[in-house]
Amino acid sequence: MAMANLARRKGYAVVLSSRSSLCLTRWRGFASGSDENDVVVIGGGPGGYVAAIKAAQLGLKTTCIEKRGTLGGTCLNVGCIPSKALLHSSHMYHEAKHAFANHGVKFSSVEVALPAMMGQKDKAVSNLTQGIDGLFQKNKVTYVKGYGKLVSPSEISVDTTEGENTVVKGKHIIIATGSDVKSLPGVTIDEKKIVSSTGALALSEIPKKLVVIGAGYIGLEMGSVWGRIGSEVTVVEFASEIVPTMDADIRKQFQRSLEKQGMKFKLKTKVVGVDTSGDGVKLTVEPSAGGEQTIIEADVVLVSAGRTPFTSGLNLDKIGVETDKLGRILVNERFSTNVSGVYAIGDVIPGPMLAHKAEEDGVACVEYLTGKVGHVDYDKVPGVVYTNPEVASVGKTEEQVKETGVEYRVGKFPFLANSRAKAIDNAEGLVKIIAEKETDKILGVHIMAPNAGELIHEAAIALQYDASSEDIARVCHAHPTMSEAVKEAAMATYDKPHSHLKSWLLLSSLVFIFVQEFTMTWR
């Protein structure tokens, strides 16, 4: 960080990432008064619209091209935002039905009004897309609705939504076209019986039986939505575990929590056949390694096998932009492709396919173009599974740290010993911190809690500034708060929990967890 600060004072741009430790470049000026754009962004998702707005704010003549007709990309229109709206609505229903009585709130009946639930989701999406439109107008970003394809490193042919064709020119072109649903061989998505995440956000009725193919973030979130409001959910996963990138300790408790909620898992299982000829769907499955086949029946099947970069029709090969075998555009630490003047950010390049990562890419790319300071460190991008409880992480898992050979220490603290969690009767989960043994530098933090997605950012800041577990432990945290569990886990990492009382609570909680695990194993 000291070197980066020195570079800033000298007038250099700085890009920090896992791909390169430090990159410097002098400020570059731009001509004004020309009809040609300084920056043209293809794609109006989180990476694209943020890059466009940032470029305009820095004084660049900017145009953004978006084929969907509404800004926000997959995230805002058919991803992050609508799914979180449904997750919250379904959680409220589940709480009303199963938890309110414990708090003295009773009523005779509760039911799901699915049209109203969908209406709330659509309202949230509409308000936010209109908000981005307003930001474009405020910052004087030219918005072209249509499908853009490269005809040269400085020209984009656009088939507009009005049926016309126009050519947009730019000194610098940023490709931010995002990603699309990854298909499965032999499983055809019709968005009726067999749906993608897009279709799962718009079902007209609650399926009695829902099968989710894929136990990743999206599949588990959408399975949770429909499971909470009445669907019998079965998750089919080819791998031996859910969310393979998750820390093993957290994963174990997370799966147990989902199973307690009624979600069923068929791990090490692959789909080998699909029959949609009847009223529902019949899936033929077998062990991933081969073996006896069985049939799973469902009303709706959700295909959630990941996402793939969306680059088809961009004419990348025509202008010579290099991609890897997965279709991702290859860029350097400055987001430059091998073609001068052409850049790429977000899901179309290597790195986690996350909206917030794309936003950071967009800002850093534009800041580089104007000689300002930009940075993205892919090793410190937080990730969240927005189920209940939520699971959030930043940095390395314990398994990844082991692979490096670095000696480390682990501190854990369960929410069963957290005063606020007990007060609100929602004490499931824990905080786990991994720190280097010699320096106490935090290497990874993993949280399972009702609000893990909010709590994780204390850890994200700590990792960004190379903090130690003692640094977190010595910060005064308000009492009673869920965030105290982060402090206690930090104390457990470098020393011990704060007080004898909390040590006793911790011991009691660990005994309780052990009994739970033993009982479930015995059953």
UniProtKB/Swiss-Prot annotation:
What Pfam families does the record tag this protein with? Pyr_redox_2 (PF07992), Pyr_redox_dim (PF02852)
For this chain's record, the cofactor binding note is: Binds 1 FAD per subunit.
* Binding of NAD(+), residues: G214, A215, G216, Y217, I218, G219, L220, E221, E237, V271, G306
| Reaction catalyzed | 2 Fe(III)-[leghemoglobin] + NADH = 2 Fe(II)-[leghemoglobin] + NAD(+) + H(+); 2 Fe(III)-[leghemoglobin] + NADPH = 2 Fe(II)-[leghemoglobin] + NADP(+) + H(+)
The protein's Enzyme Commission number: 1.6.2.6
A GO cellular component annotation here is: mitochondrion
**Record's superkingdom?**
Eukaryota
Residues engaged in binding FAD: 66-75, 84, 148, 177-179, 347, 353-356
The cellular location(s) given in this protein's UniProt record come to: Mitochondrion
Q: Which GO terms describe its molecular function?
A: dihydrolipoyl dehydrogenase (NADH) activity; flavin adenine dinucleotide binding; leghemoglobin reductase [NAD(P)H] activity
> What pairs make up the disulfide bonds?
C75-C80
Query: Which GO BP terms apply?
Result: 2-oxoglutarate metabolic process; pyruvate metabolic process
Q: Which principal EC class is assigned to this enzyme?
A: oxidoreductase
Q: Which cofactor does it need?
A: FAD
Q: Which residues form the active site?
A: H479 (proton acceptor)
What stretch of residues directs this protein to its organelle as a transit peptide? 1-30
Q: Which PROSITE patterns match?
A: PYRIDINE_REDOX_1
Tissue expr: Widely expressed. Expressed at higher level in leaf and nodules.
Quaternary structure and interacting proteins, as annotated? Homodimer.
Q: What's the family?
A: Belongs to the class-I pyridine nucleotide-disulfide oxidoreductase family.
The free-text function statement in the UniProt record for this protein reads:
Reduces ferric leghemoglobin (Lb) to ferrous Lb.
Q: What is this protein called?
A: Leghemoglobin reductase
Organism annotation: Glycine max
